[in-house]
């Protein structure tokens, strides 16, 4: 009888936000659990693909290359329609699976992806400003330095979870 191969096609890495300290830790854990096919799946980023590919090769794992986007439909939000996020009406997570590596994105498409990531980062920067206004209002005695968060806690894509992590530090 053929053995079924264990697959995890949806692993977030520090290239967007991750519970793992680095790509190596994620892949070491997958290998230890005999997961043989592993997919990187970061928000708005393909930046980790090379490292993912190389680290998979050293562990004899089969790499998948994926990407994830979050969309918001304001009409669905107003109507309370939940798509695939049970807590946020109108929000939809879209995940592209089995993308090419090396990345063959150029020109208009590469610029569109860069623009989406820049807007996502700008949105989180606006969240940081609101968080700092709240911290000031409650006289917390500290604030979150957005540029420092980007520098110390990210690999270019900043998420609201990075702000939460900075707040706990």
Language model region names:
Residues 155-169:
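Extended, H/D-rich, highly charged conserved domains that either
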Residues 2-158:
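A metal-dependent hydrolase metal-coordination microenvironment
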């Amino acid at each position: 009888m053929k053995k079924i191969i264990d697959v995890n096609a949806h692993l977030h890495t520090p290239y967007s936000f991750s519970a793992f300290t680095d790509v190596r830790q994620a892949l070491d854990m997958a290998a230890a659990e005999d997961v043989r096919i592993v997919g990187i799946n970061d928000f708005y980023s393909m930046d980790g693909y090379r490292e993912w590919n190389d680290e998979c090769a050293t562990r004899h794992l089969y790499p998948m290359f994926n990407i994830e986007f979050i969309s918001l439909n304001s009409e669905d939000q107003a109507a309370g329609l939940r798509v695939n996020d049970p807590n946020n009406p109108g929000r939809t997570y879209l995940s592209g699976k089995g993308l090419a590596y090396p990345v063959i994105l150029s020109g208009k498409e590469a610029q569109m992806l860069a623009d989406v990531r820049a807007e996502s980062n700008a949105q989180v920067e606006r969240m940081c400003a609101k968080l700092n206004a709240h911290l000031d209002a409650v006289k917390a005695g500290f604030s979150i330095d957005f540029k420092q968060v980007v520098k110390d806690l990210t690999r270019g894509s900043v998420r609201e979870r990075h702000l939460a992590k900075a707040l706990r530090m």
